[in-house]
Amino acid sequence: MPLSRSLSVSSLPGLEDWEDEFDPENAVLFEVAWEVANKVGGIYTVLQTKAKVTGDEWGDNYYLVGPYTEQGVRTQVELLEPPTPELKRTLDSMNSKGCKVYFGRWLIEGGPLVVLLDVGASAWALERWKGELWDTCNIGVPWYDREANDAVLFGFLTTWFLGEFLAQNEEKPYVVAHFHEWLAGVGLCLCRARRLPVATIFTTHATLLGRYLCAGAVDFYNNLENFNVDKEAGERQIYHRYCMERAAAHCAHVFTTVSQITAIEAQHLLKRKPDIVTPNGLNVKKFSAMHEFQNLHAQSKARIQEFVRGHFYGHLDFNLDKTLYFFIAGRYEFSNKGADVFLEALARLNYLLRVNGSEQTVVAFFIMPARTNNFNVETLKGQAVRKQLWDTANTVKEKFGRKLYESLLVGSLPDMNKMLDKEDFTMMKRAIFATQRQSFPPVCTHNMLDDSSDPILTTIRRIGLFNSSADRVKVIFHPEFLSSTSPLLPVDYEEFVRGCHLGVFPSYYEPWGYTPAECTVMGIPSISTNLSGFGCFMEEHIADPSAYGIYILDRRFRSLDDSCSQLTSFLYSFCQQSRRQRIIQRNRTERLSDLLDWKYLGRYYMSARHMALAKAFPDHFTYEPHEVDATQGYRYPRPASVPPSPSLSRHSSPHQSEDEEEPRDGPLGEDSERYDEEEEAAKDRRNIRAPEWPRRASCSSSTGGSKRSNSVDTGPSSSLSTPTEPLSPTSSLGEERN
């Protein structure tokens, strides 16, 4: 099914300042999710980064509701007394009836207040509540599915809490309850079944069935309309989970997804079209000077180079100054995350670099947690050898420096033959002998429990990337989350990303994709796909994404082999860039971080909440969406320093300019390119803020004769807007060098 080309509900004219802000004086927001102070997946990042902008809007009327976990409370939560009498009475009432409810402050930016429900302490009511769920919603939950049973307990506790909170308030506030994912969806269904006066929102960050189907190697997007969803869910033994998710989507006043591609998926699998798309953002920390993040890149790259020196000892026959670091990171879903496509493209890239005699070397990291039992001995030995060589060099350097100093002190030139004695040469020879190894550097840094059947390792064996000296592409599989306390690669994830040159995320199923978004915020170019939410968002809002270091791989309309070829082209073009071109591109990439800031994207969540209030309390709130002309779409323009395509830039008559007479130092003529970084940055900042907001909806509330009016955004759901200027025929970096 082709994607719609009409104006998107997440179009960037929404970055304009609103005339009025929402006044939550008599409204309370509860955001309910399984990952509140409980890191499991990407929803944790959404809640953690969004907390500040939501707290700024709602103040002390904003609460997060999640499960109690001992580890999470011990490391992330400061337990407190409830700040209001109503909330204190609510918690006391639930605790007196056999529940365990905790209250505190989540120790993250913004410091939001959290209500934590102890699911395990309420297991005594599981069978009764499962029976009530069956009577109310006709959803049966098998005894062996612990995750689904926890979802039932969490849902009933959440509903109990919301009902008790309303009962303890004499002046009933307008309550908005925002539920994330199916694990919290039971609570939403029960709120509607019990007719609680609550405005409900359900956000799906990925559909259950979509994730399972894509992992099963089916042609997912071309068959969305043809799936028998009940049959597919039943065959995968997730029918009860699917029913929870679908019921929550249909019961909610407002249903949202995180991207246009997921909206299409939800419409066919969950049988409800999302009311609004709420893209995921990040907390963007801007640098006071343009060169600061470039310096951080150099420092982090030096840390990675130290690891590479140790890992490839004995085979370090490539120039580290001409080495590029690529990486892929995320959940270990081999096909969904595109690791299969990345490996195939690396094999083809290796062939291209070898046959063309390139001096560039590529080290590709795979950061995907898998089952291991220990570190690889060879990997540990490599870091020990590197440290030994460093200590030996420092010892010899100190002795050499001392003798040189003494010789110069007496006014004579040193005799170089006497600067080092026999003992020093022996020490250096022993260090050199220690670097000799008979085997290739290891591909995997750990010992895998299922080495023979691991998808990444079996593919590496098939394509033959064994880190040999002849290979221009080296592969390192790190099956563990990065940590600054690791004895192998002692860097955290953020520092690692800053030190790399390119993030590669050729996902087949990626509802949003925080990894390429994090790369963008840190000024690191990345490759995404038109099947990921992030890729669609960038393709929609940027006229020429590749000029800004955002490469969009076509996995929607191309075959798997063609997608591999396109990815290989992207990688090879990137390898051909000069260092100066990469620096300029990183500057452009970092400037796109404004597009991903919660200060802007958080407004789509505001819109969803206002829409829910209008539907739940129509006597007090109104929401009037305006129709939008699709021609009013806005796209972030190409950088002014990027030349247009040759067909558009050719002179109509023979013409010779002063620029043509300037010397061109390299084959690409890079040093003749006039480029003012500060001027470029100023233009891009104006481009973000300049567009006018083409659609408005009023959301007014009346309480006791007073009215509040707020402007919120809405619009028809779609995918890609119409470009405002012609695009060049190609999207690779080759265009930038023409």
From Swiss-Prot:
Domain of life where this protein originates: Eukaryota
Signal peptide (residue range): none
Listed Low complexity bias regions: 698-738
Binding site for alpha-D-glucose 6-phosphate: 291-292, 294, 297, 301, 501, 582, 586
PTM comment, free text: Primed phosphorylation at Ser-657 (site 5) by CSNK2A1 and CSNK2A2 is required for inhibitory phosphorylation at Ser-641 (site 3a), Ser-645 (site 3b), Ser-649 (site 3c) and Ser-653 (site 4) by GSK3A an GSK3B. Phosphorylated at Ser-641 by PASK, leading to inactivation; phosphorylation by PASK is inhibited by glycogen. Phosphorylated at Ser-641 by DYRK2, leading to inactivation. Dephosphorylation at Ser-641 and Ser-645 by PP1 activates the enzyme. Phosphorylation at Ser-8 by AMPK inactivates the enzyme activity.
Pfam families associated with the record: Glycogen_syn (PF05693)
Chain intervals with Acidic residues compositional bias: 658-681
Cellular component terms (Gene Ontology): cytoplasm; cytosol; inclusion body
Keywords: Allosteric enzyme, Glycogen biosynthesis, Glycosyltransferase, Phosphoprotein, Transferase
Catalytic activity: [(1->4)-alpha-D-glucosyl](n) + UDP-alpha-D-glucose = [(1->4)-alpha-D-glucosyl](n+1) + UDP + H(+)
Gene3D superfamilies: Glycogen Phosphorylase B
InterPro entries for the chain: Glycogen_synth (IPR008631)
Record PTM Phosphoserine, positions in chain: 8, 11, 412, 641, 645, 649, 652-653, 657, 672, 698, 709, 711, 728, 732
Name of this protein: Glycogen [starch] synthase, muscle
Provenance organism: Mus musculus
